[in-house]
Swiss-Prot record:
It comes from Homo sapiens. Residues 1-25 are annotated as: Necessary for nuclear localization and DNA-binding. This is Peptidyl-prolyl cis-trans isomerase NIMA-interacting 4. It is an enzyme of class 5 (isomerase). The keyword Transferase does not apply. Residues 1-41 are annotated as: Necessary for association with the pre-rRNP complexes. GO terms for cellular component: chromosome; cytoplasm; mitochondrial matrix; nucleolus; nucleoplasm; nucleus; preribosome; spindle. Its EC number is 5.2.1.8.
Length: 131
């Protein structure tokens, strides 16, 4: 039993080091996982086939806002811009995806692939800012 205790304390030591690396992980997530608000754009389509067409356009190099204007069924904002959204103001799967994405720009968007399914339909999401 004492060796187990020793390895347990060894684990605690490692745990201390791991917590150090946890803070490093949190710093590494800074551009990705942190913050309480994200500036989001999305493309929303009810039909899977249509969202996949939009995905192909994005992959071929078409700008995100142009694809959103052409394909998105969410007419609330042109270009798919939802503005700043806070944690808790988005549906679960959309929020998880939005906070997992790195910040990117129109020229080289990083977006959800495959699209995210919610009760509203299928979303391709990109994040333009985080705070």
């Amino acid at each position: 039993m004492p060796p187990k205790g020793k390895s347990g304390s060894g684990k605690a030591g490692k745990g201390g080091a791991a917590s150090g690396s946890d803070s490093a992980d949190k710093k590494a997530q800074g551009p990705k996982g942190g913050g309480n608000a994200v500036k989001v754009r999305h493309i929303l389509c009810e039909k899977h086939g249509k969202i996949m067409e939009a995905m192909e356009k994005l992959k071929s190099g078409m700008r995100f806002n142009e694809v959103a204007a052409q394909y998105s069924e969410d007419k609330a904002r042109q270009g798919g811009d939802l503005g700043w959204m806070t944690r808790g103001s988005m549906v679960g799967p959309f929020q998880e995806a939005a906070f997992a994405l790195p910040v990117s720009g129109m020229d080289k968007p990083v977006f959800t692939d495959p699209p995210v399914k919610t009760k509203f339909g299928y979303h391709i999401i990109m994040v333009e800012g985080r705070k």
